[in-house]
Amino acid sequence: MMMDANEIISFIQNSKKKTPVKVYIKGDIADIDFGPSAKTFITGQTGVVFGEWADIEAALEANKHKIEDYVVENDRRNSAIPLLDLKHIKARIEPGAIIRDQVQIGDNAVIMMGAVINIGAVVGEGTMIDMNAVLGGRATVGKNCHVGAGAVLAGVIEPPSAKPVIVEDDVMIGANAVILEGVTVGKGAVVAAGAIVTEDVPPYTVVAGVPARVIKQIDEKTKAKVEIKQELRQL
């Protein structure tokens, strides 16, 4: 079930903000206490330490006379939302996708390189999120859809009363299309590449343009052009 905006706001507000680091270190380090958050992998005079920067920074300063050299890797600061644990997701998720915690991903979905999926978003079974597409907070995509490369589904977390983007089943969204807040894209619809969708899209229609307008009903020719290939979704 999709999180509502107030649940997401509470989750972010109450989460412990984290600045995790990875430290490569050399010196007389075997007996150094790097703090309660740290995990250490030390052999002899060298090792790697994982943990919170506040703890590790204090240990580095207190033991600088023992340390010959170190390098710190850090990719976030006071982060409120961890990334989703992907190990048991029954979907194909390619390297470089960024998926935050509290995202729902259906079985046999495909998340391509560079896709970004924010907290509270839902990806239905068999849906493909293509390269560099963005699903904002609470955006919901149904089953057997294709969200094209570079497309944006606007997120809605604040104001909490705002309606999220909803994409129903069997929808094809073209590359670089933008679906604005509160829009529902009806079942079986097609959104042309580059379209900016500001109003609801009726089921089984094709919309195109800026702003997007209905240009025709789905016909057999259109169905052939936007066919979803299940072979790409097999695990």
From Swiss-Prot:
Superkingdom of the organism of origin: Bacteria
What's the Enzyme Commission number for this chain? 2.3.1.89
Q: Which reaction(s) does its UniProt entry say it catalyses?
A: (S)-2,3,4,5-tetrahydrodipicolinate + acetyl-CoA + H2O = L-2-acetamido-6-oxoheptanedioate + CoA
Keyword Kinase part of the UniProt annotation: no
One MF annotation (Gene Ontology) recorded for this entry: tetrahydrodipicolinate N-acetyltransferase activity
Pfam families documented for this protein: DapH_N, Hexapep, Hexapep_2
Q: In which pathway does it act?
A: Amino-acid biosynthesis; L-lysine biosynthesis via DAP pathway; LL-2,6-diaminopimelate from (S)-tetrahydrodipicolinate (acetylase route): step 1/3
Tell me the Gene Ontology biological-process terms attached to this UniProt entry: diaminopimelate biosynthetic process; lysine biosynthetic process via diaminopimelate
Q: Does the keyword Nucleotidyltransferase apply?
A: no
Q: What class of enzyme is it?
A: transferase
Task performed by this protein: Catalyzes the transfer of an acetyl group from acetyl-CoA to tetrahydrodipicolinate.
Q: Which NCBIfam families match?
A: DapD_Ac
PANTHER family recorded:
2,3,4,5-TETRAHYDROPYRIDINE-2,6-DICARBOXYLATE N-ACETYLTRANSFERASE, ACETYLTRANSFERASE
Which family is this sequence assigned to?
Belongs to the transferase hexapeptide repeat family. DapH subfamily.
What protein am I looking at? Answer: 2,3,4,5-tetrahydropyridine-2,6-dicarboxylate N-acetyltransferase
- Quick one: which gene encodes this? dapH
